[in-house]
Amino acid sequence: MGNAFDGAAFLAHCSSHPGVYRMLDAKGELLYVGKAKNLRKRLSSYFRTSGLAPKTAALVARIAQVETTITANETEALLLEQTLIKEWRPPYNILLRDDKSYPYVFLSDGAFPRLGIHRGAKQRKGRYFGPYPSAGSIRESLGLLQKAFQVRQCEDSYFRNRTRPCLQHQIRRCKAPCVGLVEPAEYAEDVRHSVMFLEGRSNALAEELSAAMERAAVHLDFERAAELRDQIALLRRVQDQQSMEGGSGDVDVLAAVVKPGGACVHLISVRGGRVLGSKNFFPQVGIEEEVGDVLAAFLGQYYLANPERDLPGEIIVNATHEDFPALVLALTEQRSRELHIRHRVRATRARWQQLAIANAEQALSARLAHRQHLAARFEALAEALDLDAPPLRMECFDISHSSGEATVASCVVFGPEGALKGEYRRYNIEGVTAGDDYAAMQQALTRRFGKLREGEGKLPDILLVDGGKGQLAIAQEVLRELAVPDLILLGVAKGVTRKPGLETLYLNDAVHEFTLPADSPALHLIQQIRDEAHRFAITGHRARRGKARRTSSLEEVAGVGPKRRRELLKFFGGLQELSRASIDEIAKAPGISKKLADSIYAALHSE
């Protein structure tokens, strides 16, 4: 214990700014990622001499190093925190379900553009603003923008088939351009105001609205003045969620990350205020190298040693170094142009800086992934269960439904090399009482292990079921009836608070009940597999439920197959709008004749 982390010494030099902190153990393994409005104040709570919760005390006992990243505000800290948790899955963090990508605000092209949420590749014509730290934050921003400027958010298929204003117009969230209740010039002004805000020009926008408010007051239009006052207040509330766009000038953003075993420098190129792209570099450095040392070496080799390479007028870095003044002087003389290297930045540049840090963290994590944390967890599980050797194959089952609707069971498979996604299976559960998880589990296990009799499938070493004694008893019964050779049964029951780290485990006949420490690698493996089974089950359930709810009277119409049905619903914006359409309106849809339109109309109005 002589090498215990010196919290007091660390806090003496810790920033009081907002940011993200990362706690690592003596092996350099990430234990916990957190965010704070005041880093020093938040971190001081971990190093009190008394009053720590047991789980917190266990965490602090393992800390060998704490790393911090200063951010411009709490929103930026949240973005970075989520990125790191997503990539590292630290054992002391609550592991939220992973989103595949951060959402963007999308503004479409056209005479009456729409605002919406976008994920994935940017293939649609229009403008993108973001990324945002969460779907919740982007929905809040869109809701406030909708309230302030009333730009439509409906899909184009819905928009072009309206014959009267929708509910959004009635509650003053849309000016109903679909039915001509707003002039194109007025709508364009609302779009322009929305873009100003999304570009980060909220101060200029607020000044413009303030001037309009004063003019309204002078003309005694107090109702309009009050509306403008409320718009300004709304804008101030969401200034922290502005997009990456809206910067100016040419900038290279460099973020270096150094960890045991390697380093990464992530470069983001910004030209004319727009992010053009990014790239990772992995210099060979020693473990003792500091971030500033890595950055100084990179600047010299990347720019100074390559005079033909484009050099912007500004370089943003995530650490400082004593060699920077000399590098600036040398590059200025070499390129005959002014150069600034900045460490402390704000607003959009701070956003670029934090995103570069997050990307460097992710890239380095992938670079060092062959250390195979998962293999070590399998070893720990073997020790916890007193096995002679680590298991080679683990399967986990979970059930998902909505009040008994569209029940789906999942089976995920893991080996020492990780998830074996090619062997995942889903089972649509039929013929059981709605909401009966035991019957659903019985059916899924029977279908899975019944295949073994036919020589199909592999026998797992460990079968995990998400549930307590009841689910474990069902699994035992099924395996007994099918004469499945001996395998280890492990039930995972959440604690009373349903928080990770408080699970109760049941082994085989459920007589052996035990728990594992919250920092146990064996427990982390069990949680990881269970959470993956839950994710796989719930995505399957949602897909099945959505398909069932989309079925309609259209299925009874000859000549309207699945493809044409999808195209019809897309064209009209949903079944409800299609049902309201006349025969002539239906016939305007691509591929629909007058005769077929008559049949569709009759089917939809047969009652």
Swiss-Prot record:
Family to which this protein belongs: Belongs to the UvrC family.
Sorted alphabetically, which keywords does the UniProt record give? Cytoplasm, DNA damage, DNA excision, DNA repair, Excision nuclease, SOS response
Q: Which SMART domains match?
A: GIYc, HhH1
Residue runs in coiled coils: none
User: How does the annotation summarize its subunit structure?
Assistant: Interacts with UvrB in an incision complex.
Which NCBIfam families did the record assign? PRK00558.1-5 (NF001824), uvrC (TIGR00194)
Family matches, as HAMAP family = UvrC
Indicate the transmembrane segments per the record: none
Name the predominant localization: cytoplasm
Localization, per the record, is: Cytoplasm
> What GO CC terms are in its UniProt record?
cytoplasm; excinuclease repair complex
For this chain, one GO molecular function annotation is: DNA binding
Q: Which organism is it from?
A: Azotobacter vinelandii (strain DJ / ATCC BAA-1303)
Q: Per the record, a Pfam family?
A: GIY-YIG
Q: Which residue intervals define the domain GIY-YIG in the entry? A: 16-94
In terms of Gene3D superfamilies, this protein maps to: 5' to 3' exonuclease, C-terminal subdomain, GIY-YIG endonuclease, UVR domain, UvrC, RNAse H endonuclease domain
Keyword Magnesium tagged? no
Name-wise, this protein is UvrABC system protein C
Superkingdom field:
Bacteria
Q: Name one GO biological process term.
A: nucleotide-excision repair
Looking up InterPro entries in the UniProt record yields: GIY-YIG_endonuc (IPR000305), GIY-YIG_endonuc_sf (IPR035901), GIY-YIG_UvrC_Cho (IPR047296), Hlx-hairpin-Hlx_DNA-bd_motif (IPR003583), RuvA_2-like (IPR010994), UVR_dom (IPR001943), UVR_dom_sf (IPR036876), UvrABC_protein_C (IPR050066)
Every UVR domain range: 203-238
Its annotated function is as follows: The UvrABC repair system catalyzes the recognition and processing of DNA lesions. UvrC both incises the 5' and 3' sides of the lesion. The N-terminal half is responsible for the 3' incision and the C-terminal half is responsible for the 5' incision.
What the entry lists under SUPFAM superfamilies is as follows: C-terminal UvrC-binding domain of UvrB, GIY-YIG endonuclease, RuvA domain 2-like
